[in-house]
A protein has these predicted regions:
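Short secondary-structure boundary micro-motifs
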Residues: 1-4, 11, 34-36, 43, ...
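Arg/Lys-rich, often Gly-containing low-complexity segments of ribosomal proteins
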Residues: 12-13, 33-36, 40, 62-67
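N-terminal first-folded block
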Residues: 1-29
């Protein structure tokens, strides 16, 4: 079982970034629109890069179609 974090996603952002709001709580801005899973894929890519893990280890547990998501890393 890996690290679980709460993430609020901001799609269509000018700049992609990860901001830690509190322990295990993040706000992630992605440049992609929330259409056809593009923002979710961008979220996985950004979090994998931020935490230094493979993309395959980052999973969306809850909130596939919502801005507030539960992510498992590892």
């Amino acid at each position: 079982m890996g690290l679980k974090i709460a993430v609020t996603v901001k799609p269509n952002a000018k700049k992609a970034q990860v901001v830690e709001l509190a322990e295990k709580q993040y706000r992630v801005a992605v440049r992609e629109a929330a259409q056809d899973g593009k923002a979710n894929q961008a979220l996985v890519d950004i979090l994998a890069d931020h935490f230094g893990v493979a993309k395959s280890t980052v999973k969306i547990i809850r909130g596939h179609a919502a801005r507030h998501k539960l992510i498992e890393i590892g």
